Amino acid sequence: MASSMLSSAAVVTSPAQATMVAPFTGLKSSSAFPVTRKANNDITSIVSNGGRVSCMKVWPPVGKKKFETLSYLPDLTEVELGKEVDYLLRNKWIPCVEFELEHGFVYREHGSTPGYYDGRYWTMWKLPLFGCTDSAQVLKEVQECKTEYPNAFIRIIGFDNNRQVQCISFIAYKPPSFTGA
């Protein structure tokens, strides 16, 4: 029924047009594109991300325990800790103070499975600081924890309660008895 409704003008065909572009026949040989190469094999002349930059060692592989974020830096001062907590609060993360009395780093004691480490879970100091708006409140809690447990490692974590993940974690205090090995 639909075919009977077509007009005769719609069915008219036009003759094939001659194409203006030659059909694709594949890639041309490399001999058509002359390439000149530098004979200089000097590494400083190669374009790269850092060929002329003196490389620096970031992490010593032996004799230094790895803690949390920023663990490759020297210990943070009170002012630097305050700035990190301000960053945490600006991102609307919930600050929480945790401490560990024995091992302030991941270690392997109870399992040999790849990816399994002990020492990832620390004891929470009080409750997370829900509604905290000032870094001084968090640093006050760190100071109280330090007074209560002077031989404990203390860290500050930032928890995103929308995504339900820990977003940042860094060491706020290392005990004086810790030698760094």
From Swiss-Prot:
Main location: plastid
Pfam families for the chain: RbcS, RuBisCO_small
Complex formation: Heterohexadecamer of 8 large and 8 small subunits.
Source organism of the structure: Brassica napus (Rape)
Any GO BP: reductive pentose-phosphate cycle
Gene3D superfamilies for this protein: Ribulose bisphosphate carboxylase, small subunit
Protein name per UniProt: Ribulose bisphosphate carboxylase small subunit, chloroplastic 1
UniProt similarity note: Belongs to the RuBisCO small chain family.
HAMAP family reported for this sequence: RuBisCO_S_bact
GO terms of molecular function: ribulose-bisphosphate carboxylase activity
Entry keyword set: Calvin cycle, Carbon dioxide fixation, Chloroplast, Photorespiration, Photosynthesis, Plastid, Transit peptide
